[in-house]
Amino acid sequence: MTNFKLKIASRRSKLAMVQTLWVKDQLEKNIPNLEVSIEAMATQGDKILDVALAKIGDKGLFTKELEAQMLVGHADIAVHSLKDLPTNLPNGLKLGCITKREDPADALVVNKKNDCYKLENLPEGSIVGTSSLRRLAQLRNKYPHLVFKDIRGNVITRIEKLDAGEFDCIILAAAGLKRLGFESRIHQIIPSEVSLHAVGQGALGIECKSDDKKVLEIISILEDKPTCQRCLAERAFLRELEGGCQVPIGVNSKIQNEQLCLTGMVASLDGERLIKDQYIGDINDPEEVGKELAKKLKQQGAEEILSEIFKKFREK
């Protein structure tokens, strides 16, 4: 039988390559006569490291270049950290598969000087590094006595900056730390009561051409249904709020008693205004669950908070 060749577009960061290699290995292991190759490239978000992500804008910061490769026929699929994939995709492309989720929580990483502290008892004035407005807003709301500084670069670069003393601690996704072999650096898993995670955090999203039935069939073997249901609800929530990957919107989802329970949060940049609510709905209609939760938050003032944030972004 003739081998079927599949090309993956990927970011070239260490974490992106670890994730893409996992997808490659799983596909080749499960599908006979499949040859998978990888084309790695830098995205806009990888190149601009001296500006806070929120100031650049978030329309495909880490995805546009990969999508362009698929649209011109140079790649068949793109592997993304699902949290980086916008909810509205270019014409001709679709989210073809969502893989089994790693721990979606945020994690506290400290240097040796601060390994006796947890987030809740860090001394006043401790410097916390994060590039996420979502984490920033929630932690400012909970711990106004801490100092928050923007930190850019890949996971390894951020840990190096922490160990060099530029920060007392940093906040990173637990999933990325585990995938890179840095699980031992997780000092504390931050509970969802303190920080709701990003939409799609911990899961991989595989994007492909909407009409490529062969590729859709191939990647379907990696689909994890419970993860897919949860993440589709989270993405519908974000889409309904017309938010993006870089705004203070957080979620937590779980499946219980054959129902989908989604918690969502919208906060102001300073953390002083924070709206949080929950919606429980049909597990087989995750999009509706996300939309209904978004409507509940809108009724409580979420749109006003987000419009103020977008106005500030436009002024910068």
Swiss-Prot record:
Question: What's its EC?
Answer: 2.5.1.61
Protein encoded by which gene: hemC
Q: What does the subunit section of this Swiss-Prot or TrEMBL entry state?
A: Monomer.
Q: Where is the signal peptide?
A: none
Kindly state which reaction or reactions the protein catalyses: 4 porphobilinogen + H2O = hydroxymethylbilane + 4 NH4(+)
Family membership, please give it: Belongs to the HMBS family.
Organism equals: Prochlorococcus marinus (strain AS9601)
**CDD domains, alphabetized:** PBP2_HuPBGD_like
From what superkingdom does this record's organism come? Answer: Bacteria
Q: Which UniProt keywords apply?
A: Chlorophyll biosynthesis, Porphyrin biosynthesis, Transferase
PROSITE patterns assigned:
PORPHOBILINOGEN_DEAM
Cofactors that this protein relies on: dipyrromethane
UniProt xrefs under HAMAP family? Porphobil_deam
S-(dipyrrolylmethanemethyl)cysteine, modified sites: C245
Q: How is the cofactor bound?
A: Binds 1 dipyrromethane group covalently.
What's the name of the protein? Answer: Porphobilinogen deaminase
